[in-house]
């Protein structure tokens, strides 16, 4: 871990040219054993930091990058241009991984990586509507070209019980009922269309208290998960990804909150009960102190790795 922290300090200066810093970069690429060479899937291509590290790990490595965000793919194509046809780009949700691997790798790959977090590029783009910290349209769609329902339309049409369920389940929000009631009551005065409208409504409904997170943090997380059906996507990925691995292949997943991590932990535990799979890190790996200080987004990250071992 000390060595990885030193490596992280070196990487930080190299990565500061982009807003988004990949989390657990060395740990995840080492977990995939990418230095052995092979075909890998980055199921959440994002800014391309993990994909680039995999491509650097071996001169013959090929990365199939999947992302439902067309803007992210366009940016990353420029970043990885030097790698030519070793980098393949697919605009799709990662629940489509089985058909993607069938099309581009004859059904089997040496490793799969999924970083389940929202990228800094998405959060900092006010027009995407992910953040309560700046005013923007209440959108939150990962793929506005293919997804019809934005956060604004979802909140305008859902029942109070549905909204409460999202807040309670996806945001683990203890004031879910109170906030849901306030959202529905607001409809009498007009639709919530802006991020600051929703954030202000939650703040008026729930006392900020002393320090800690903004009171709208859990609400925004919950609505984002609902809009993008994120946990359904994760469940579908975890169901099909293990069978896409060659013998010795690995699946590495980085989660950022307890709901995701619980899904990953339970899935890996169930797979490991079979003689075909090994849960490589029983408790997972968390970022070193240097990474957390330099990139606060990483503080809740946890990496879990599953290995296919049929010999």
What are these regions (language model features)?
Residues 2-311:
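S-adenosyl-L-methionine-dependent methyltransferase catalytic core, i.e., the SAM/SAH-binding region
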């Amino acid at each position: 871990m000390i060595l990885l922290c030193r490596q992280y300090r070196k990487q930080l200066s190299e990565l500061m040219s982009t807003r988004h810093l990949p989390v657990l970069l060395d740990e995840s690429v080492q977990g995939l054993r990418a230095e052995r060479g092979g075909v890998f899937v980055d199921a959440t291509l994002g800014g391309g930091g993990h994909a680039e590290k995999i491509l650097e790990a071996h001169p013959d490595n090929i990365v199939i990058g999947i992302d439902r965000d067309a803007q992210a793919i366009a940016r990353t194509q420029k970043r990885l241009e030097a790698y030519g046809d070793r980098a393949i780009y697919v605009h799709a949700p990662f629940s489509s991984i089985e058909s993607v691997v069938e099309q581009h790798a004859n059904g089997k790959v040496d490793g799969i990586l999924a970083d389940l977090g929202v990228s800094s590029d998405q959060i900092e783009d006010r027009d995407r509507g992910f953040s309560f910290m700046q005013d923007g349209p209440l959108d939150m769609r990962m793929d506005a070209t293919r997804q019809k329902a934005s956060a604004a339309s979802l909140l305008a049409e859902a029942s109070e019980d549905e909204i409460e369920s999202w807040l309670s389940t996806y945001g683990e929000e203890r004031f879910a009922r109170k906030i849901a009631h306030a959202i529905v009551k607001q409809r009498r005065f007009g639709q919530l269309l802006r991020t600051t409208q929703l954030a202000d409504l939650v703040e008026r409904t729930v006392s900020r208290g002393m320090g800690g997170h903004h009171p709208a943090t859990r609400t925004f997380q919950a609505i984002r998960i609902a809009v993008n059906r994120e946990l359904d996507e994760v469940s579908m990925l975890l169901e099909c990804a293990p069978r896409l691995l060659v013998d010795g292949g690995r699946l590495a997943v980085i989660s950022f909150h307890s709901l995701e991590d619980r899904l990953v932990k339970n899935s890996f535990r169930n797979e490991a009960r079979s003689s075909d799979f090994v849960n490589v890190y029983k408790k997972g790996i968390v970022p070193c102190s240097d990474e957390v200080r330099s990139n606060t987004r990483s503080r809740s990250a946890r990496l879990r790795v599953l290995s296919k071992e049929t010999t």
